[in-house]
Amino acid sequence: MKRDNRYCLVCLPRNRTIYFHQNEDGKVWLFCNKCDRGYSLEQYCEIADIDLTEFLTGDFHMQEAKPDEVQAMAWPSTFIPLSDPRAARGVEYVKSRGLKPDGDMYYDMKEDGVVFPYYVDNHFCGAQVRFVDVRIDEDGKEWKITTLPGTRLGLLFGMWNQAKLFPNIKAVVVCEGYFNALALQQAFNTKYGGISNNPWKCIALSGSSVSEHQAESLKDLKDQGYKVIAAPDTDGAGLKMLAKMKEKDCITHYSLTNDTEKDWNNLLQDIGHDELAKFFMKSIRSINE
C-alpha cells in the first residue's frame, strides 16, 4: 500500500494537511495548511529528511490551479523587513547593487536572500528570492534566484499590483527583472524629487517571457493612453521579448542600454541615479521608428 503523501512530514499533523499543485512549467509544489507555507518538492524533502525518489513512490492527490487565477498566500514568517537588524546581509547586498534599500523588498532569513513580493490589489500572491550568494545547482549551473511555490509569475508583475495607477503616472516602463525596474524607479524618483512627483512607473515581468495575461494588461494600459515603454536587456532573450511585445501591440516605445554586457542595474552602478534617468530618457524610441 502506498504511503499517503498528504500527511506532512515536517509538522507531523494527525490529519491530511498537504495539497499538491502543478505550475504552468509542469513543476509540482505543495502547500501545508498547518505549516502555513508552500514548498518545492526538493525543499520539502530536504526539510523532512526524506529521499526524493522514496517520496515520489507515495500517493499524490493533485489539485490543479485554475488557469487564470492567483491565490492569496500567507506571509512567510521568514520574510522580515530590511529595517530589521537581522536583515543586514540583505541590506548590504542591495547596496552593493548600487540600489537604495527602499521600496517593497524584504529579507528571507531561511534562504539568505532579498525578497521580491508580488501582489494583486492588496493580496500577497507570491515572491521570488534573490540569493545573497550565488549557489550551484545539481547540474553545476549558477542558481541566483528561487520562486516561492505557488507563485504564478505569468499572472503577476513585479512592483505593480495591477490596480489603477496613481494620477501622476504618465508612462509605464517594463523591465525583465526586479532589480532593473527598481534601478530605473529609484533613478526617476531621484530626478523628480520623490515618488509623488514622478510620472514614471517601473515594473518587471520577472524574466524575458511575456505571458498572454501580461501582454493584455499592458495593452489595456496603452489603450488608456499611457506610454508603455519596453526596457529589456540588450541580448538575444531581451530582443526577442521586445519583438514579441511589438507583435502583441502592447507597447508604444522602447529603450535599450545598447550594451550586451550591461543591464539597467549595471548602468546604475556605473553612472548613478541622476545620469541613469537622463540616459534612459535619451534612449527612448517609438516602436514605429
Feature locations, PLM:
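A generic alpha-helix surface/boundary motif
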Residues: 39, 88-89, 178
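Short glycine-/small-residue-rich flexible loop motifs, especially phosphate/cofactor-binding loops
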Residues: 42, 91, 181
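Structural detector of coil-to-beta-strand junctions
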Residues: 15-18, 29, 113-115, 172
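Short Cys/His-based metal-binding microdomains
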Residues: 19-55
